[in-house]
């Protein structure tokens, strides 16, 4: 059994950027890199699942998800890990864990973006009379890059920054 094959970096990268619909393919590739003999080992699967579980919980905690919410979401993980007896069951459990983490990430990012856009709109309303007010000024205020802010602002409000600023100035 080769424990060095567990790659926590690729898991963390997927947790940060992966999409829910790509989880199955990611887990398939991830478990393939671990090797069939490792996936057929009960001891290896238990080790891997605990390692992944801890990685997922650390990830959502770093995202700012409340500890009570993490504990509630993953409360039965010890029993679930103990019940895994095959490589296929391990892969299914990994998929469940990652999907839950991605949903928590997306919910958290949605709330974060929503509050940033609210802050940006308040800043615009307070400073709209300044002729030099620009998208980059507002993006700096909320701590986002100009391009990311522009995209997020349009998605959240349905208006571009310029359209919103113009409507505020006209009111």
Model-derived features with residue positions:
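Cytosolic nucleotide-utilizing catalytic cores of signal-transduction proteins
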Residues: 1-171
